[in-house]
Amino acid sequence: MSSNNVVIKIAQPYAVALLDLAKTKKVTEKVSQDIQSIQNILAQSDKLKIFLANPLKTVEAKKEVIIATVGDQINENTLSFLMILVDRKRIGMLDAIASKYLELAYQMESLTIANINTSIALSPDQETLLTEKIKVMTKAKEVKLIISVEPELIGGFTIQIGSKVIDTSIRGQLRQMASHLDVVVT
């Protein structure tokens, strides 16, 4: 089993527990916003990610940093959950747990996540049109687009919804032609 699968297996019960707590306390939307904020902070700060994952740092130090960083910005239930992760030495997996939580929360809300990689930024009209097409394609009530610009696609875009990938990029087309011609393309 790959290390990624192990992380997912460990993250799942924590994500489920947080979702159950949020549903019980009727704060699912607030906790989801908190988790998204935390993910954004982690994405912007490699130092924080490394600090939280460092087994040599004390539990108290990690709790102090979490409280100083997000303590006044998040719901008390979310903060308590983070403290439990620190106590159980799982705070280093926070990013994976957060991703799993959001995936479960979005499933509960019938929200589909679509990861879009484009060669250039999309206009608001293009985003709206793409959202509507994906709603029809997936029969979802709501679609959330996570858009990233990757100039190396040359042109076009890729869409990933769950395990399904739609590649309309020029890079993808070149790879497909190269495979038909038995040529290696990087």
UniProtKB/Swiss-Prot annotation:
Regions that span the bilayer: none
Membrane topology: Peripheral membrane protein
GO cellular component: chloroplast thylakoid membrane; proton-transporting ATP synthase complex
Subcellular location: Plastid, Chloroplast thylakoid membrane
Classification via InterPro entries: ATP_synth_OSCP/delta_N_sf, ATPase_OSCP/d_CS, ATPase_OSCP/dsu
Molecular-function GO term, any one: proton-transporting ATP synthase activity, rotational mechanism
Keywords: ATP synthesis, CF(1), Chloroplast, Hydrogen ion transport, Ion transport, Membrane, Plastid, Thylakoid, Transport
Function comment: F(1)F(0) ATP synthase produces ATP from ADP in the presence of a proton or sodium gradient. F-type ATPases consist of two structural domains, F(1) containing the extramembraneous catalytic core and F(0) containing the membrane proton channel, linked together by a central stalk and a peripheral stalk. During catalysis, ATP synthesis in the catalytic domain of F(1) is coupled via a rotary mechanism of the central stalk subunits to proton translocation. This protein is part of the stalk that links CF(0) to CF(1). It either transmits conformational changes from CF(0) to CF(1) or is implicated in proton conduction.
The family this protein is said to belong to: Belongs to the ATPase delta chain family.
Subunit structure: F-type ATPases have 2 components, F(1) - the catalytic core - and F(0) - the membrane proton channel. F(1) has five subunits: alpha(3), beta(3), gamma(1), delta(1), epsilon(1). CF(0) has four main subunits: a(1), b(1), b'(1) and c(10-14). The alpha and beta chains form an alternating ring which encloses part of the gamma chain. F(1) is attached to F(0) by a central stalk formed by the gamma and epsilon chains, while a peripheral stalk is formed by the delta, b and b' chains.
Protein name per its UniProtKB record: ATP synthase subunit delta, chloroplastic
Organism: Pyropia yezoensis (Susabi-nori)
Gene name of this polypeptide: atpD
